[in-house]
Amino acid sequence: MHFPVFIMQNHQRRALVLFSGGQDSTTCLAWALDRYAHVETVAFDYGQRHRIELDARLNVLREIRGRFPAWAARLGQDHLLDLKVLGQVGDTAMTSDRAIEMQANGLPNTFVPGRNLLFLTLAAALGYRRQLDVLVGGMCETDFSGYPDCRDDTMKAQQVALSLGLGSRVTIETPLMWLDKADTWALADSLGGESLVQTIVEESHTCYVGERGQRHDWGYGCGECPACVLRKAGWSRWAERAPR
C-alpha cells in the first residue's frame, strides 16, 4: 500500500490527538505530527484494567521528542483527564478483573459503552479552549473487535454533532479507519522508519490485561487478548510483505 507524504506547510491547522499510548494512537500521533503545524495529546484515566498504558504513553512521548527533532518542535502540551465515571456506568472486562469473552450481542465484553463518544466530546471541549480544531483518533473498522463507536458512520455523525454543539468547525480525522493492522505497521514505517517502528514495539502498550513481562517481536503483551491477537497478526502479515 502506498501512503501519501503530507507536507506540513499545506496544513496550518492545530490538532489534538487522542493518545492512549498504544500502537494505533502512536501511529496517529506520528501522522498528525507529519501533517499539522501544532499537535497536542490527550488521554483519559477511566479506571482501565490496563492502566499501565498511562505510563507507556509518557515513554512514547519521550522517545518521539528525543528521536524526531522536527516533530518535537510541533509537539505541544500533553493532557490527562479523569473519566473514572466510565467504570461506574459500564462495568466491563476493560475496567474490572474478569475473563475476556464474547457476549450474546457479538461484541467482546471489553466493549465500554459510549467510551469513544465521551472521549471525543471531552477532547472537542478541550480543543475548543485551546484552539485545536482537528481531533485525531485511532478508530478503525477494518481490523477491529466490532465496537460500534469505532465505525466511520459514528465518527461522521459525531463530527457533525460536535460542530453544531460548539458552534465552530470540528474535524475528526481517523487515518487508520480503512487500514488493517499490517497496513498500520506499514504506515508507521513510512512516517518514521525503523526508529518509529522500534518505539512502537518497545514503548507502546496495547494488551488489555496490562502484561509487560512477555516480549514478542511485535512488542509486549499476553498474546491472547483481542488487542494482542490483532497486533500480533498484523505484525506477521507486514513482516511477510516486507521482511526485516
Swiss-Prot record:
Belongs to the QueC family. Binds 1 zinc ion per subunit. SUPFAM superfamilies: Adenine nucleotide alpha hydrolases-like (SSF52402). Its EC number is 6.3.4.20. Its cofactor is Zn(2+). This is 7-cyano-7-deazaguanine synthase. It catalyses: 7-carboxy-7-deazaguanine + NH4(+) + ATP = 7-cyano-7-deazaguanine + ADP + phosphate + H2O + H(+). The lineage of its organism: Bacteria, Pseudomonadati, Pseudomonadota, Betaproteobacteria, Burkholderiales. Zn(2+) binds at residues 207, 222, 225, 228. Catalyzes the ATP-dependent conversion of 7-carboxy-7-deazaguanine (CDG) to 7-cyano-7-deazaguanine (preQ(0)). ATP binds at residues 19-29. Pfam families: QueC. Pathway: Purine metabolism; 7-cyano-7-deazaguanine biosynthesis. PANTHER family: 7-CYANO-7-DEAZAGUANINE SYNTHASE. InterPro entries: QueC (IPR018317), Rossmann-like_a/b/a_fold (IPR014729). Coiled coil: none annotated. One of its GO terms (molecular function) is zinc ion binding. Keywords: ATP-binding, Ligase, Metal-binding, Nucleotide-binding, Queuosine biosynthesis, Zinc. GO terms for biological process: queuosine biosynthetic process.
